[in-house]
Amino acid sequence: MEGKLFLCPTPIGNLEDITQRVLNTLREVELIAAEDTRNSLNLLRHFSITTPMISYHQHNERERTEELIGRLKDGLQLALITDAG
């Protein structure tokens, strides 16, 4: 069974502006791919989300894309978040 990729927008300013649906998704997926893990870690800690996270940005996009597509084909549930928005 193929996995699913969830595109999860994050708040630009106030962390409390995130939707409950996004919070649920971030808790339920197996892995979070984040543009900047330092910024994203603040969000995850604020909401006590312990899902594993990896970096995914313009400098590692080629390598990570192949890796993530392979993991999605293996059934991984993955959320992709950016720094803000």
Residue ranges: model-predicted function:
Residues 60-68:
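Glycine-rich, highly charged phosphate/nucleotide-binding loops
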